[in-house]
Curated annotation (Swiss-Prot):
GO terms for molecular function: ATP binding; UDP-N-acetylmuramoylalanine-D-glutamate ligase activity. Pathway: Cell wall biogenesis; peptidoglycan biosynthesis. ATP binds at residues 112-118. It is found in: Cytoplasm. It comes from Chlorobium phaeobacteroides (strain DSM 266 / SMG 266 / 2430). GO terms for biological process: cell division; cell wall organization; peptidoglycan biosynthetic process; regulation of cell shape. Disulfide bonds: none annotated. One of its GO terms (cellular component) is cytoplasm. Its EC number is 6.3.2.9. Pfam families: Mur_ligase_C (PF02875), Mur_ligase_M (PF08245), MurD_N (PF21377). The keyword Translocase does not apply. Belongs to the MurCDEF family. HAMAP family: MurD (MF_00639). This is UDP-N-acetylmuramoylalanine--D-glutamate ligase.
Length: 464
């Protein structure tokens, strides 16, 4: 799209907002940045250097004098400024959509409730490995790494952009068309933003493939009940090539052009009547990368790589060297016979349940944060089976105590530091301390990364 001379309002002056404001300015647009909170000193200086006018502490009517608006993913559709723009008929786009207008590289878009970051990181490693041989670059952008807008102008046609996409980012995508789209799974999350309806949340996720054509590929998790049913009834209407992945030997995959599965302790790529063994389980599963969910992440990455013609050697090399992602069931230390695990990225109960299933043995669980409207009783079975004691923190601690009180030993802590101290006192040799909040972090921390770093520091500071 030609944006030269267009008036553009950018709502939000954090990383993606700053990046898209600079991109649009470089492309000749007249940009105005509006921030509800305070703009940092570095960001203010950068905007002034670029001669981009801005405001902070609220959104004035200036944002309504615009040809279109780029909206931060953190701003919900019910926000007054968004409603005012919609009433005036102002088009709203996400930073991802705008960056896509200027992208020359091949694109792999990855979304889902859980597993996005691990899958995106693994896909990036595969293409990074292959790129060293075939002389192209792989970029990791979007919800992971740097904003898409900050790197898009350096991307060449032979390069690959691996983009992790949240539902919030997909809301503002209208023409975005990845060469390969990946959906890792869909379970209830962020329902407070989607009127409490899983259907609304899922429909937003499906936007990732909405504009794909016959030359493109859609990869999805066929073990996910919602995705299985959705594509069983819709795949004949989609023009793109569809590649399911799943655990087990599945005869129903014979109807697809290709499929990736985990069968007989190895990853197998099926293409028609031909099957290829990609890698043995023992060559990629390890202490820092284990569990059914990580097998699924590896299957998704293999499917995405094969969709763009990557050979098995590069795939195997990347998988063998992959040791997981920070804050995802990350081993921190062993103290007095007990392992301490940081799973701060578990921001919903599905991720919490996966951690409980994956980490072996009994454990002391530290959980809680800002509740997303979850029903914690849904995972009562695995909690009863695996959790010896629960230390609840954050805004959700009373709800957690009510859900699991009488089922396990439940304690309440006013801070993460207190929770770590309680866990230290409760854990027995041979058990694990698992920090897997099952909630968002914004009640007590900047984000899940800040939360995870604080847990790791508190844990490493403990003395034997």
């Amino acid at each position: 799209m030609d944006v030269a001379g267009k008036k553009v309002a950018v709502l939000g002056a954090r990383r993606s907002g700053m990046a898209v404001a600079e991109l649009l300015s470089l492309k000749g647009a007249s940009v105005f940045v509006s921030e509800l909170g305070t703009i940092g000193a570095h960001e203010s200086a950068r905007l002034q250097a670029l001669r981009i006018p801005f405001e902070e502490g609220g959104h004035s009517d200036n944002v309504l004098c615009t040809d279109f608006c780029v909206i931060s993913p953190g701003i919900p559709g019910r926000a007054p400024v968004v409603r005012a723009m919609l009433e005036k008929g102002i088009p709203l786009f996400s930073e991802i959509e705008v960056a896509y207008w200027f992208c020359k590289a091949r694109i792999i878009g990855i979304t889902g409730t859980d597993g996005k970051t691990t899958t995106a990181t693994l896909v990036h490693r595969i293409f990074e490995t292959d790129g060293m041989t075939h002389r192209y670059r792989a970029f990791s952008v979007g919800n992971i790494g740097q904003p898409f807008s900050s790197r898009v102008l350096t991307m060449r046609p032979e390069d690959v952009a691996v983009i992790e996409l949240s539902s919030y980012q997909l809301e503002g995508c209208c023409t975005f068309r990845p060469d390969v789209s990946v959906i890792t799974n869909i379970t209830p999350d962020h329902l407070d933003r989607y009127e409490g309806e899983l259907h609304n949340y899922a429909q937003t996720k499906y936007r990732i493939y909405a504009h794909q054509g016959k030359e493109d590929t859609l990869v999805y998790n066929d073990d996910d009940p919602l995705l299985h049913d959705h594509f069983a009834s819709n795949r004949e209407t989609l023009p793109c090539r569809i590649v399911p992945f799943g655990i087990g030997c599945k005869p129903e995959h014979a109807g697809f052009a290709a499929a990736v599965r985990f069968c007989d302790h190895r990853i197998v790529f099926d293409a028609g009547a031909k099957s290829e063994n990609i890698i043995e389980a023992e060559d990629f599963l390890k202490r820092s990368f284990r569990g059914r969910h990580n097998i699924a992440n590896a299957l998704a990455a293999v499917a995405a790589a094969r969709a763009l013609g990557i050979g098995n050697e590069a795939i195997r090399s990347a998988l063998q060297g992959f040791s997981g992602v920070e804050h995802r069931q990350e081993f921190v230390r062993t103290l007095d016979g007990s392992d301490w695990i940081n799973d701060s990225k578990a921001t919903n109960i599905n991720a919490l349940s996966q951690a409980l299933e994956t980490v072996p043995g009994r454990m002391v669980l530290i959980a809680g944060g800002r509740d997303k409207g979850s029903d914690y009783r849904e995972i009562a079975g695995i909690v009863r089976k695996k959790v010896a004691a629960l230390v609840a923190i954050g805004e959700a601690r009373e709800k957690l105590c009510a859900a699991y009180g009488g089922m396990v030993d439940v304690r309440s802590a006013n801070s993460l530091e207190e929770a770590v101290s309680l866990a230290r006192a409760l854990v027995e040799p041979g058990q694990t301390v698992l920090f897997s909040p099952g909630c968002s972090s914004f009640d007590m921390f900047e984000d899940f990364e800040d939360r995870g770093r604080q847990f790791k520091k508190l844990t490493t500071d403990l003395r034997s």
